[in-house]
A protein has these predicted regions:
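Hydrophobic beta-strand core residues of beta-sandwich domains
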Residues: 93, 142, 169-170, 218
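General N-terminal targeting signals
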Residues: 62-66, 146-148, 153, 168, ...
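A composition/biophysics-driven feature that prefers long, compositionally simple stretches
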Residues: 1-160
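A charged, amphipathic alpha-helical module
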Residues: 139, 146, 160-181, 185
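Structured catalytic/translocation cores of nucleotide/phosphate-coupled proteins
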Residues: 83-87, 150-151, 164-169, 182, ...
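Residue-level marker of positions within ordered structural domains that often coincide
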Residues: 37, 156, 163, 187, ...
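Short catalytic-site patches enriched in acidic/histidine residues
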Residues: 7-12, 133, 173-228
Length: 228
């Protein structure tokens, strides 16, 4: 799921694969997937979350304790702390010599998940790592009714933000105020932020593909380009 950013100016987001599998947006951790056909749900997947840290939670907010409430919320029966992961992996490796990673076997930019498997495999004779990075993209390419409904809701939220921004545009208005109106339009109908920082460029700035400043006053005749 990746390491949390400690920059106060940036909000933390989990890896899209981790979010897809768990639904979690505010917890980092790991998930080990087993046989999905096993009739015992507790043996299908184990979710590992970081231990509670009362000192940090004084500043960042309380996190949920392990228990039925958390299990029901994420739909995963077995949830443990990451401190127990080495013991579980040691037990698993006695029954299989093949580990699969949902992250690409890339020679550079190795994910923490793959790095962990490589460390385990290096200590186990004949242990191999299989690239299964194609599985989740294949699953996500087919949308359920619930997912389609969520996509439509996102479309509606986006449309409202653009409508509000278009109505606000006028000569003398700064680009960042157009951005603020856009994001306000998202928030007021249930949006929780955008996938990336909005690009709002007027005049010549509208031709800059990844324009970032959003800090120019608009003038009469400007074409305003919004990417969000």
């Amino acid at each position: 799921a990746g390491d949390e950013s400690h920059a106060l100016s940036e909000s933390w987001k989990p890896h899209a694969h981790f979010h897809y599998l768990t639904g979690l947006t505010n917890e980092s951790g790991s998930a080990i997937l087993f046989d999905p056909t096993n009739p015992v749900k507790s043996k299908q997947v184990i979710l590992f979350l970081r231990p509670l840290n009362p000192e940090m939670e004084k500043w960042d907010g309380l996190r949920k304790e392990l228990g039925s409430e958390l299990s029901n919320a994420v739909g995963i029966k077995t949830i443990m702390r990451t401190t127990q992961m080495p013991r579980v992996v040691a037990d698993v490796i006695t029954r299989t010599k093949t580990l699969a990673t949902l992250m690409p076997l890339s020679p550079s930019g190795t994910s923490p998940d793959l790095s962990y498997w490589q460390q385990v495999a290096s200590n186990i004779p004949e242990c191999s790592i299989r690239d299964s990075s194609h599985i989740i993209p294949a699953l996500r390419s087919v949308k359920s009714k619930a997912e389609i409904d969520i996509i439509q809701e996102a479309v509606n939220i986006t449309a409202n933000g653009f409508k509000q921004a278009m109505q606000a545009v006028r000569s003398g208005l700064n680009e960042y105020k157009v951005q603020a109106t856009l994001e306000y339009g998202y928030a007021m109908v249930g949006g929780r932020g955008s996938a990336f920082p909005p690009i709002v460029g007027g005049g010549l700035n509208s031709t800059v593909l990844h324009y970032k400043e959003n800090d120019k006053d608009l003038v009469d005749g400007d074409l305003v380009c919004i990417d969000s």
